[in-house]
């Protein structure tokens, strides 16, 4: 997936990180899994949203890519 296929908020933050206005996180996979886990655990959100986040987090965890 490329940035242009993402929502406006993601594109805005991408531009801010690229320009140095927002912090870059070297351990991006760990950051993504934590954020997805937070969404999956938030019982105030619709179940469908939580399940999508949990599925994405589980796939990242089972992948062979590791942050170093």
Swiss-Prot record:
<protein>
    <recommendedName>
        <fullName>UPF0253 protein VP2335</fullName>
    </recommendedName>
</protein>
<comment type="similarity">
    <text>Belongs to the UPF0253 family.</text>
</comment>
<dbReference type="InterPro" id="IPR009624">
    <property type="entry name" value="UPF0253"/>
</dbReference>
<dbReference type="Pfam" id="PF06786">
    <property type="entry name" value="UPF0253"/>
</dbReference>
């Amino acid at each position: 997936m490329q940035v242009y296929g993402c929502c406006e908020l993601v594109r805005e933050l991408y531009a801010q990180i690229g320009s140095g206005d927002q912090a870059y996180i070297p351990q991006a996979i760990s950051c993504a899994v934590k954020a997805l886990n937070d969404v999956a655990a938030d019982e105030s959100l619709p179940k469908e949203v939580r399940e999508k986040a949990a599925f994405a987090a589980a796939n990242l965890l089972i992948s062979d890519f590791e942050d170093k």
